[in-house]
Amino acid sequence: TSDNSFVAEMQVTSRRPVYNSTYITTLINYRDTKFEFNYTPGESLDLSNITLSNNLVAVISFYSYVVIGLDFDSFSLNGGAPYFARAMEIANMAQSLNTKGWEPFSGKNDNRYDLAVALTDESSKAFHSFWYNYHRNGLDEMAANASRGRIRIIQAMADLQKLYDSRPSSPLLLIIGETKLDEIVRICSQATAEEKQAVKKQLNQIFPTKGYLINNLK
């Protein structure tokens, strides 16, 4: 917008390998449309545990902890908790910056503060259970036994339903919808007819705008 002042969008993407295979699964594909910051060439970018004075540092640090947390969560139950807690601390400190994207409880899916709350709130514990079981007990099993891995993924969707029932507007559902929906449909295409119909019904309830993708499950 002016010298040293920038308005941008950020696409945050992270992937992880699936055990004993060449397949790579996406953990986050998140678009942040409220990224405003000041930067002077040569300026030192340091993260403090006490205060924040630069939104560029705040946003990059925040998403770094979210990405690391999602990765750890996919390998061990609640393994990402320390990193999500740090992201929440950054979101709280960023309130002093008075910049877009950090407004508390905005109800918007692309708000960093609301994402941090969702990742740390007790009401979202079903997400962490789903995330771990889907990846570690589901995807990571498929190379050894595709049927067993698929069944565990379908079983993990009970936690996805719990998340939707408790927080139907959770930004975590956006993350799942953007990274896992197509994958679930492809995996469940090999399920029984009864399983396919149950999965399709559940996904259409949770992701009503994604019918064009979900209804490929036949």
Give the residues covered by each predicted segment.
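Start-of-domain marker
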Residues: 1-11, 18-20, 27-29
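Compositionally biased, intrinsically disordered linkers/stalks adjacent to structured regions
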Residues: 33-83
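A mature extracytoplasmic/lumenal domain signature
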Residues: 12-14, 41
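A cross-kingdom marker for long, charged
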Residues: 139-218
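Short, solvent-exposed secondary-structure capping/transition elements
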Residues: 4, 21-22, 73-80, 189, ...
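Short, well-structured alpha-helical interface segments that form or flank functional binding sites
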Residues: 5, 55, 59, 175
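Surface-exposed peri-terminal alpha-helical interaction modules
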Residues: 3, 30, 45-55, 144, ...
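Extended amphipathic alpha-helical interaction segments
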Residues: 64-174
